[in-house]
Amino acid sequence: NAPPNLTLR
């Protein structure tokens, strides 16, 4: 899974 930071943006 991609980092949450990238998911939010």
Swiss-Prot record:
Glycans are attached at residue 5. Binds 2 calcium ions per subunit. Binds 1 heme b (iron(II)-protoporphyrin IX) group per subunit. One of its GO terms (biological process) is hydrogen peroxide catabolic process. Its EC number is 1.11.1.7. It catalyses: 2 a phenolic donor + H2O2 = 2 a phenolic radical donor + 2 H2O. Belongs to the peroxidase family. Classical plant (class III) peroxidase subfamily. Removal of H(2)O(2), oxidation of toxic reductants, biosynthesis and degradation of lignin, suberization, auxin catabolism, response to environmental stresses such as wounding, pathogen attack and oxidative stress. These functions might be dependent on each isozyme/isoform in each plant tissue. This is Peroxidase 8. It comes from Daucus carota (Wild carrot).
